[in-house]
Amino acid sequence: MTRDVQKPVSTKDFLKDVFICSLGAYGGPEAHYGVFTDQLIRKKQYLTEEDLIELIALTQLLPGPSSTQTLVAIGYKMGGPKLALLTMLVWSLPVIVVMILLSFLSELLGVFHLREDGLRYIGPMAVGFIILAAYRIGTKVVKDSFTLGLLIFGAVGTFFIRASWIYPAVLFTGGLLAVARSKEKDIWHRVKLDPPYKYLFFFGFFALGGLLFSAFFDHVLIDLFESFYRYGYLVIGGGQVVIPLMYTELVEIQNYMSSQDFLTGFGLVQGLPGPMFSFSAYAGAMAAKG
């Protein structure tokens, strides 16, 4: 990294740049990376593009919102846990608040025909952001025939196999092939890991506690907490992957909302900047209303 926790940046300036990213981040995580590159690397040089690519690869292996995790990791590198938390709030809180408010204004949106007519041009714009981000990242990582082969392998695998497990499987396979091909010595013994196991304890406590409370107590808020927490720790691939799962549970199984209300919220989040997972705020508010 170009900067680290020992040499923190100005909290105010960094959070201002994060807020600028949140205002221009349309189109899901793939497009978000292009925004991060422009604002945090090209303009402010908080880190290098190679550093960003490494963080993206790491977060792709983890469940949950990948672009949010990437940005929070950058915040942690710049200023430690406090700045990481503030980064997450500045990045996600504005659009989450907007989505919650819109869940209570769905009838008004229908009157003004914003369900479909006002949002039909957002999709093509988002595709443009995604193509630009893919090109910029591709020029940095595809350097020879081997990396080109990995790119084709990943693209073909994820295109034909539509399952959440394919993403970490492709990344693990590519990583193993790269390590096996590498001529570096003792590559497995260079990094000493000392993970904070207390965080794993809290994660397991809430995961198991949510399942138990949901099984023994029939309350909509408990069920919603368990469902959304489970989405966060099981779903790999970002907001686009979790949407079908949410639709099945919230609309078809639990009947917390209508299909039209669900699709309206999905259309709205496509037209707003910020993380795709903010759709969970809309869906949760709609479900809580009953």
Q: Which residues make up each language-model segment?
A:
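Multi-pass membrane proteins that catalyze or facilitate reactions on polyprenyl-/lipid-phosphate substrates
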Residues: 1-62, 73-290
